[in-house]
Amino acid sequence: MSTRAGQDLRDDEVVRVRGLSKTYPAVRGRRGAPGVPEVRATDAVELDVRRGEVFGLLGPNGAGKSTLVRQLTGLLRPDAGQVEILGHDVVRHPERAARILAYLGQESTALDELTVSLAAETTGRLRGLEVRRARAERDAVLEELGLTPLAGRPLKKLSGGQRRLACFATALVGERPLLVLDEPTTGMDPVARRAVWAAVDRRRAERGTTVVLVTHNVIEAETVLDRVAVLDGGRVIACDTPAGLKERVADEVRVELVWREQAPLEVPEVAALRERAAESGRRWTLRLAPEEARAVVATVTGGAAFAALDDFTLATPSLEDVYLALGGAARQGLVKA
């Protein structure tokens, strides 16, 4: 049964979030251990997810992505705000979330003792499928993802990428209209990643399945997302298509310089660049106007600095550049080290 508020959802809306806030209280330190300060994990978050799209939540560690997802899936009650999924108020009725979505979290240890086959079948049974249909869906999903040869192996004995793919398989059994995937391709090789996104695309085309994807892999985000909300400090600081977001920094070029051992700071032009560069070990990253970028490349490749240069790249802006341009607090960027 839909809630009264849910009747106001647009026809193409699957998820509606309004004013969602969650604060973790401060924890006092014990026996000399430092305490933990109060954390505003989500701060008045508002967003909509449309039917059939892959909607991304992008941000660095601590941005509030996983806390937001736990509230979307009914696993964590917010302090304030609304979450409606297909017309259901999952703040007031969190038990309904399991009937309308499949959630793949970062950790899925509950299935570790089961074989790949039994994990998929059991998940289907828990989602209300009768035995014959659960087994049929299990077999189809394992074949689709290339997991049939591993069907009899316990998840705990698989490699990290294989285990992650097996857990993704369980999310597909039962054909939920909404998939909430928290970094689903972590540890996977390129073949497995392609299998994941092919499976997602197939369900979008055939069933109108909607996906909420948590990631801080900007390369993956730019490839698979229809729209993306950029989070920082628990707030949504931007929401648009990847192309729309990158338009905000269209007048910049990213220059990356990698030095062989250390930057030749005795070269005046290099010393001057250091003030504008983000340094990470031997790598310097600069975000410059196109004319400046060309001048920098000419300087380091045509002068005394060239002997110290190991590599350089000149690239158009990425979503990470957008995040930094918007004032994101994690100055080292979005991608996991």
Give the ranges of each region predicted by the language model:
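A short, proline-enriched helix->beta-strand linker immediately N-terminal to the Walker B motif
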Residues: 173-177
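Walker A (P-loop) phosphate-binding loop of ABC-type ATPase nucleotide-binding domains
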Residues: 60-64
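Helix-to-loop junction immediately C-terminal to a conserved catalytic motif
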Residues: 73
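ABC transporter nucleotide-binding domain
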Residues: 197-290
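Conserved ABC ATPase "signature" region
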Residues: 16, 20, 121, 125, ...
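Conserved ABC transporter NBD signature motif
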Residues: 81-92, 96-97
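Catalytic Walker B motif of ABC-type/P-loop ATPase nucleotide-binding domains
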Residues: 179-183
